[in-house]
């Protein structure tokens, strides 16, 4: 052959790409550059490795090809390219000839990370056996294990977590791969991690656990798996939230039921002082309120001076108010602001709830510490319909507050002539 070097190199590239081992051997014997590259920066070794031409790879290595050269674009090596194409025999050969299993590409990834991302379990096992470092992190702070988790490869997860202590490793935020898997809703991965010894009660920097992560997404299967593995059901994060609190906030009734069946504390308060029932009542989640009440939730517990009933009334949640009353909530309980449920219904102008409370025999003449009655509140708000209904249900028109004022005096002070007329007709005295 009388080709010049440039032509030999071009011909070598073509021969490698087509898998022509005889022509490759001949070109190498006639002096072709064993490390020649194509327009993308791939050496002939990289091309052969990626295409799975094991014997060509062997010939190139025998001819002195640089096994650990980096491609100009993305900084890839022959081993990385072979791993990315699942070329098992080539990977074995490259490793046996000294390929650097921990070489890092432009993104900080290794051959093991590539295999983990794609789920190539045999490649992963070969690399691990050759000393691949499972703790290397890329520019996205991902490890091989994290990539296997994110891309849902449970068999790879088990392989990566065997014979090392990375299953419980935490990132800068204290997150474990178990927390990540629970958050993503990957049940198989969660099960694989648990079987590999993952600690279900490790906390991140916010004191959140895998159980809280699973609860936030409402995944009942993962929640059950974590509880079966010993997750602390009443653990509180830095805000004092438990899994039950989170389930109520997200309105996951099935999760609420599971947690209660497994022993969640129905009376526990978060750091704001809220019980699960107070949250459910405030949001008007009647179905959840019913479940909590059936589990023994205390309706008379207060936070910021409010009980479940007064919270539900103040937010206008009629079904929740009715449910609480049917369960025996104290209809005349005073909130710390001196208002009963009846007064709150009046001041918030919820006539349907107001009528319900009257029908349930709310005390229309109850006076708070300042002597104010529901009638006085209705007059002060200028709600003539509420005034008439209170009178129909027996409101005492001549009661006085601590300042000596009657409902009529309040009406006249505010120049509510229509209400003054109603009160006088009901027997109000000057």
Feature names for model-found ranges:
Residues 1-11, 130, 159-166, 172, ...:
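Ankyrin-repeat-protein effector appendages
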Residues 1-30, 39-42, 62, 430:
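Intrinsically disordered, low-complexity regulatory segments in ankyrin-centric signaling systems
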Residues 5, 38, 71-73, 105, ...:
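Ankyrin repeat boundary/linker residues
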Residues 8, 41, 74-75, 108, ...:
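Start-of-repeat signature of ankyrin repeats
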Residues 14-19, 47-53, 81-87, 114-120, ...:
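Ankyrin repeat A-helix N-terminal signature
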Residues 23, 55-56, 89-90, 122-123, ...:
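Conserved ankyrin/ankyrin-like repeat signature
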Residues 25-32, 58-66, 92-99, 125-132, ...:
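Ankyrin repeat domain, specifically the short helix-to-loop turn at the C-terminus of the second helix
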